[in-house]
UniProtKB/Swiss-Prot annotation:
<comment type="function">
    <text>Probable E3 ubiquitin-protein ligase that may possess E3 ubiquitin ligase activity in vitro.</text>
</comment>
<feature type="compositionally biased region" description="Basic and acidic residues">
    <location>
        <begin position="80"/>
        <end position="91"/>
    </location>
</feature>
<feature type="compositionally biased region" description="Polar residues">
    <location>
        <begin position="429"/>
        <end position="440"/>
    </location>
</feature>
<dbReference type="GO" id="GO:0016567">
    <property type="term" value="P:protein ubiquitination"/>
</dbReference>
<protein>
    <recommendedName>
        <fullName>Probable E3 ubiquitin-protein ligase RHG1A</fullName>
        <ecNumber>2.3.2.27</ecNumber>
    </recommendedName>
</protein>
<dbReference type="GO" id="GO:0061630">
    <property type="term" value="F:ubiquitin protein ligase activity"/>
</dbReference>
<feature type="compositionally biased region" description="Polar residues">
    <location>
        <begin position="204"/>
        <end position="213"/>
    </location>
</feature>
<dbReference type="InterPro" id="IPR045191">
    <property type="entry name" value="MBR1/2-like"/>
</dbReference>
<feature type="region of interest" description="Disordered">
    <location>
        <begin position="151"/>
        <end position="235"/>
    </location>
</feature>
<feature type="zinc finger region" description="RING-type; atypical">
    <location>
        <begin position="637"/>
        <end position="678"/>
    </location>
</feature>
<feature type="compositionally biased region" description="Polar residues">
    <location>
        <begin position="317"/>
        <end position="328"/>
    </location>
</feature>
<dbReference type="GO" id="GO:0008270">
    <property type="term" value="F:zinc ion binding"/>
</dbReference>
<dbReference type="InterPro" id="IPR001841">
    <property type="entry name" value="Znf_RING"/>
</dbReference>
<feature type="region of interest" description="Disordered">
    <location>
        <begin position="71"/>
        <end position="91"/>
    </location>
</feature>
<keyword id="KW-0862">Zinc</keyword>
<comment type="pathway">
    <text>Protein modification; protein ubiquitination.</text>
</comment>
<feature type="compositionally biased region" description="Polar residues">
    <location>
        <begin position="395"/>
        <end position="406"/>
    </location>
</feature>
Length: 691
């Protein structure tokens, strides 16, 4: 039987599949070889042959499609014939997206099958996503259209919105109509020949997506809009079968596995489209995506096994490979957002591998937990610019079923000029040790230590300067050197920059970067803040001591030790210490009446007087007699402030001061002190009798 030839043309580029005659049952053998790559995982994503007649089949997982297979070729003569008849009138829903004129090519889940053939079908899942290609940058230009199938050959029809199929036998049409965004899975195949091309996407055991939606608005690169829901993270692997040597070169692009609804991939590569000759691949070759660096893969730009990202609408994620492009500005109203991540295609690890040996599927999640993003789930805006300085590279090992896949993500927090790498994973302790020993790391620690020292002395120096610190060399030496610039830490995540700035009296601003970032500890900062108030009082007290010594400089009677003994709080407890002898040093003679009342209320009423019997026995009494002295020389009673009259009882204390007898008795009952000289009024000690 003469073989049929199927051609899929895309403008100037064409993808040719040429198959020879097949009379054996080699299709089954080839699919068995393919299943050896990961039988356990493929059986979760493939449906049985008995279920292949359904036009719109649901996947095994809820709203998840884990496998896409496409096969072209001639029907084998040994296949079953009872399953092909249901595909002659197979229909599908196409989604047409408005906007952007004729510069967008819409590729929805398109199913093309030549009519008039009775080939048995295999399980093929054509869940192609909606793809938009900018005409001004992309070398491949296309109009809105669908695939036309004319007999044995298929090609892309540019101008139309209808899907036509003209077969040799019966003719069937698949109409394209606008539908809602509800995504439906389409299962089908054209033949069971194993010489056709297909893409096999497998889901890792430990991979999962956190539901969320993203909006991608780059100037160039990869633009993604829609919702990502329960798709695999990281890279995907595809199996490329044999192609004839005569097949032309065709661009190999990575198709990201996703079970989202209406995911839009806009590819605007600024460089030339790299091609890969299919003849260089052998049967069963495992291609690790991305193959060419110019192909921007969705899955390699999203973090593989990094964190569960909750991407909310209105946030941007930009991928760019053009180093000369303008950075994307952060929209207003996003002041609470974190600094952006920058993802580019510059640091990319990929290639081809002929090894299909099984490897472990467990993902090294511990490597990704030590990154600068805290927590397992993080709501983070992702604004990226195409230009970055130095990249903080952290490799995450991704092991997919029976294929070793490595991904190197390039992450950088925005900064001014210098990019500081975040703490690496625990597996690279050697690299972290070398970073700690680097001159840059040591310089940062030295600068922060200097800032801590200056913050402790900043307020002290300022107060000393305001309070005549120039007169005292001791206080002048405590002040930091006068300089117009000071180093102030600026917050910026792992890319914290050191800038020259006027030194602030309030001290430097430290941004707490987390436990993993080396910085000034909080106890030290609290000590610096508490020392400001204490240092102000200390400076004031020291100024008073020095002023007292200066005033007494001529007499040379007062020493520094004497002053410090009188006010020892300067040397010991400072402002927070309790001086229990403070009340004894009060100058009550120079206090006002209001101050004395306040002092009395604070001290309280303490009875230190004597009883009436002691007063009667100890108080000397006499009658007042006027003398020849002038009335101006006579003093009134100090207690009642009344003048003495002739014959009044007078009481005399041991100090010799006289008062009205009744007045001094009441006084002594309260306080056994002389109201005038403050000495002991009555001696209560028993006197020895003289024999």
């Amino acid at each position: 039987m003469q073989g049929e030839r199927a051609s899929l043309g895309y403008l100037s580029e064409a993808l040719n599949f040429e198959h020879g005659s097949s009379s054996s049952n080699g299709v089954i053998d080839h699919w068995e070889n393919i299943h050896s790559l990961g039988d356990n995982d493929l059986q979760d994503y493939m449906i049985a042959n008995s279920e292949s007649n359904t036009s719109l089949a649901n996947s095994v997982y809820h709203e998840q499609q884990g496998l896409r297979r496409f096969s072209l070729g001639e029907a084998s003569s040994s296949g079953t014939k009872d399953e092909a008849s249901s595909h002659n009138e197979q229909r599908m829903e196409t989604r047409c997206f408005d906007g952007r004129g004729n510069e967008i090519i819409d590729l929805d889940p398109v199913f093309a099958q030549p009519s008039g053939t009775n080939q048995p079908v295999q399980n093929v899942n054509l869940n192609a996503e909606y793809i938009e290609i900018h005409e001004d940058i992309n070398p491949y230009r296309g109009r809105s259209g669908f695939i036309e199938a004319n007999g044995p050959g298929t090609r892309v029809s540019q101008p139309g919105r209808s899907f036509e199929e003209n077969g040799v036998g019966t003719g069937s049409s698949v109409e394209g109509r606008r539908a809602s965004c509800k995504r439906k899975a389409l299962e089908g195949s054209i033949s069971q020949s194993s010489s056709g091309g297909y893409h096999d996407f497998q889901r890792g055991e430990s991979s999962s997506w956190t539901p969320g939606s993203t909006v991608f608005r780059p100037g160039n690169g990869l633009n993604i809009s829609g919702s990502l829901d329960n798709g695999p993270r990281g890279m995907v692997s595809g199996t490329v079968p044999n192609f004839p040597v005569s097949a032309p070169n065709f661009p190999v692009s990575a198709i990201a596995e996703s079970s989202s609804r209406n995911i839009c991939v806009r590819s605007n590569p600024s460089d030339h489209q790299e091609t890969v000759n299919p003849s260089t691949f052998a049967a069963g070759t495992v291609v690790r995506r991305p193959v060419p660096p110019s192909q921007l893969n969705l899955s390699r730009h999203l973090p593989a096994d990094q964190h569960s990202l909750d991407l909310r609408p209105g946030q941007s994620f930009v991928v760019s490979r053009n180093p000369n492009s303008t950075p994307v500005s952060i929209p207003p109203g996003s002041r609470t957002m974190l600094p952006p991540f920058r993802w580019t295609g510059s640091s990319l690890v990929g290639g081809t591998s002929n090894s299909t040996a099984p490897v472990e599927r467990n993902l090294h999640l511990d490597e990704t937990r030590s990154r600068s993003i805290p927590g397992n789930t993080l709501e983070i805006p992702m604004f990226a610019a195409p230009e970055v300085g130095n990249f903080a590279r952290s490799q995450s090992s991704r092991n997919v079923t029976n294929g070793n896949l490595n991904s190197a993500s390039s992450v950088s927090r925005t900064g001014s000029t210098t990019s500081v790498p975040p703490p690496p994973p625990p597996s690279s302790n050697l690299a972290w040790t070398s970073y700690q020993n680097s001159p840059h790391y040591q310089r940062r620690r030295t600068e922060r230590s200097e800032l801590a020292r200056r913050s402790l002395l900043s307020s002290l120096a300022a107060d000393a300067t305001n309070q005549r610190s120039g007169d005292h060399p001791t206080l002048r030496s405590l002040a930091p050197p006068a300089s117009s610039d000071g180093l102030v830490l600026q917050p910026g995540g792992d890319n914290s920059q050191m800038h020259n700035r006027a030194y602030s009296r309030a001290g430097p601003l430290f941004d707490r970067q987390g436990d993993s970032v080396v910085g000034i500890p909080h106890p030290l900062r609290a000590l610096a803040a508490a020392s400001r108030g204490r240092s102000r009082l200390m400076v004031s007290q020291m100024q008073n001591v020095l002023d007292v010594m200066r005033r007494d400089a001529n007499n040379n009677n007062l020493r520094l030790e004497d002053v410090m003994l009188l006010n020892h709080s300067v040397l010991f407890d400072g402002a927070t210490g309790h001086d229990r002898y403070r009340d004894m040093r009060l100058d009550v003679d120079n206090m006002s009446y209001e101050e004395l009342l306040a002092l009395e209320e604070r001290i309280g009423d303490v009875c230190t007087g004597v009883n009436e019997e002691t007063i009667s026995n100890r108080l000397k009494q006499r009658k007042y007699k006027s003398n020849t002295k002038s009335p101006q020389d006579a003093e009134p009673c100090c207690v009642c402030q009344e003048e003495y009259t002739e014959g009044e009882d007078m009481g005399t204390l041991e100090c010799g001061h006289e008062f009205h007898s009744q007045c001094i008795k009441e006084w002594l009952k309260q306080k056994n002190l002389c109201p005038i000289c403050k000495t002991t009024g009555l001696n209560t000690a028993k006197k020895r009798r003289i024999a």
